């Protein structure tokens, strides 16, 4: 393991006219960009990744920390996407133990509410088939109430238990980047792409600037890949003004583990809009999430949770555990988006 790219040294060489020509330049230091860099190096390309903040600064460090096999895709009838997601989950479990680990999910049933036990059994059987292991099972009320103390027993009809995975998302990005760099790739953080270079109307490189606001450096590449996530339109609009990205925000709230200690994931449908809600353990805390709303604020500013989102998540939790002390703003350890 050689460590990460020496950015000061590489930038200095670029300013002196070295390392200006690349086969592939990847813009964006999240999991998508990191994965592309690794695959580019595996194919033998001279490849460089550029990130304007720190690696995994955006969505790739602010996820729900789950590697799911696309259960909701299956429920929506998208068999192909579900199969692909499940197989990728299994691959990550095999290749990144300690970063990606299996965890049990419990989807609760209530009388008269959809989906019921039979529907979920069918869905989960297909789900497990794609994974190559049948491990879903029915969990009765007794076991469920032992695992999730204070759960509302009104119309409760047990739960389906199935396996998905949790991930340390930011560390996974760093692992993939490290693999890429060990294989001869390069990655620069705190280096902003200020503009795209065009030759005969085609992108032929980028103009970059270090975080110290020094002079611009022009880099050439026949292939420039936009892996900037929510920022993709901003970069792409240099050559195409069409808007394709709809920024969304999913927020979580975090409470002390002592307030609600769990070791598995409980999932249920919100009483208001029937969206899926998860309660799960993470790094010695308990997390409740997530919301799903349009993010209309400046994406360069750190996103934050709104009071309405906090109320939504508090209502979700308290509706399931009415006999417990109601969780309120005073119990929150953090608000995450």
Stretches with model-predicted labels:
Residues 1-23, 39-42:
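Extreme N-terminal leader/targeting segments of oxidoreductases
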Residues 24-48:
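N-terminal Rossmann-like FAD-binding beta1-loop-alpha1 element of flavoenzymes
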Residues 42-60:
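Glycine-rich FAD pyrophosphate-binding loop
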Residues 65-147, 277:
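Dinucleotide-binding Rossmann-like beta1-alpha1 core, especially the glycine-rich loop
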Residues 109-188, 196-202, 283, 323:
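Flavin (FAD/FMN) cofactor-binding and adjacent substrate-gating region
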Residues 214-223:
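Core beta-strand elements of the Rossmann-like FAD/NAD(P) dinucleotide-binding domain
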Residues 226-239:
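Flavin (primarily FAD) binding-site architecture
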Residues 330-337:
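Conserved small/polar residues in nucleotide/adenosyl-binding loops
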């Amino acid at each position: 393991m050689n460590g990460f790219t020496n950015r000061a040294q590489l930038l200095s060489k670029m300013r002196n006219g070295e390392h200006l020509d690349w086969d592939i330049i990847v813009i964006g230091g999240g999991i998508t960009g990191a994965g592309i860099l690794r695959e580019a190096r595996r194919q033998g390309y001279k490849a460089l990744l550029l990130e304007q903040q720190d690696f995994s600064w955006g969505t790739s460090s602010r996820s729900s920390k789950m590697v799911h096999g696309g259960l909701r895709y299956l429920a929506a009838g998208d068999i192909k996407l579900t199969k692909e997601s499940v197989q990728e989950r299994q691959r990550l479990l095999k290749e990144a133990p300690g970063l990606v680990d299996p965890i049990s999910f419990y989807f609760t049933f209530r009388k008269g509410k959809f989906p019921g036990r039979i529907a979920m059994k069918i869905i989960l059987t297909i789900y497990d088939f794609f994974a190559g292991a049948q491990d879903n099972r029915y969990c009765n009320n007794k076991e469920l109430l032992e695992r999730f103390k204070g759960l509302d027993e009104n119309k409760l009809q047990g739960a389906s238990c199935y396996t998905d995975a949790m991930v340390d998302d930011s560390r996974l990005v760093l692992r993939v980047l490290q693999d890429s760099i060990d294989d001869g790739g390069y990655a620069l953080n705190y280096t902003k792409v200020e503009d795209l270079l065009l030759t005969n109307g085609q992108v032929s490189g980028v103009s970059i600037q270090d975080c110290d606001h020094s002079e611009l450096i022009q880099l050439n590449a026949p292939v420039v890949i936009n892996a900037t996530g929510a920022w993709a339109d901003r970069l792409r609009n240099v050559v195409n003004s069409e808007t394709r990205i709809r920024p969304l925000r999913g927020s979580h709230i975090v409470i002390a583990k002592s307030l609600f200690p769990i070791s598995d994931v409980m999932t249920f449908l919100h009483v208001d809009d029937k969206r899926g809600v998860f309660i799960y353990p993470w790094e010695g805390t308990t997390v409740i999430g997530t919301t799903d709303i349009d993010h209309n604020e400046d994406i360069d500013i750190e996103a934050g949770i709104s009071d309405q989102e906090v109320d939504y998540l508090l209502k979700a939790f308290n509706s399931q555990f009415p006999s417990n002390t109601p969780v309120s703003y005073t119990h929150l350890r953090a608000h995450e988006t």
